[in-house]
Swiss-Prot record:
Annotated Gene Ontology cellular component terms: cytosolic large ribosomal subunit
Keyword Glycoprotein tagged: no
InterPro entries noted in UniProt: Ribosomal_uL14, Ribosomal_uL14_bac-type, Ribosomal_uL14_CS, Ribosomal_uL14_sf
Pfam families in alphabetical order: Ribosomal_L14 (PF00238)
A single GO BP: translation
Entry's Gene Ontology molecular function annotations: large ribosomal subunit rRNA binding; structural constituent of ribosome
Family label: Belongs to the universal ribosomal protein uL14 family.
Tree of life domain: Bacteria
Cross-referenced CDD domains: Ribosomal_uL14 (cd00337)
Native species: Shewanella frigidimarina (strain NCIMB 400)
Subunit structure comment from the entry: Part of the 50S ribosomal subunit. Forms a cluster with proteins L3 and L19. In the 70S ribosome, L14 and L19 interact and together make contacts with the 16S rRNA in bridges B5 and B8.
Protein name per Swiss-Prot or TrEMBL: Large ribosomal subunit protein uL14
Length: 122
């Protein structure tokens, strides 16, 4: 459950390390974002000489949350940290690698690239 001002780890090699949610996209007064939702983020911490710089604003998709996601069989998949993958204007990932596991809920037409790059799909 991500809302405005939430900080997230970055799960790709775009160069950003920490980002802060500045808007939850999808609806006029939408408050929370979960796994698979697109948010607008600002880069708060980045590595030197990388594509993403501190202060840059990007779209991102949430790939891991502490709140988790409930499956139809009743099981819940939760993670230790909140994480997102930075996206370009065409909603394609900026990085070429994904770090850490992602969930099956990302397996739709928009995010198949992220699922195929991920080392583990839960």
């Amino acid at each position: 459950m991500i809302q405005m001002q939430s900080t997230l780890d970055v799960a790709c090699n775009s160069g950003a390390r920490r980002v802060q949610c500045i808007k939850v996209l999808g609806g006029s007064h939408r408050r929370y974002a979960g796994i698979g939702d697109i948010i607008k983020v600002s880069v708060k911490e980045a590595i030197p000489r990388a594509k993403a710089k501190k202060g840059d604003v990007y779209n991102a998709v949430v790939v891991r949350t502490k709140k988790g996601v409930r499956r139809p069989d009743g099981s819940v998949i939760r993670f230790d940290r909140n994480a997102a993958v930075l996206l370009n204007a065409n909603l394609a990932p900026i990085g070429t690698r994904i770090f850490g596991p992602v969930t099956r809920e990302l397996r739709n037409d928009k995010f198949m690239k992220i699922v195929s790059l991920a080392p583990e799909v839960l």
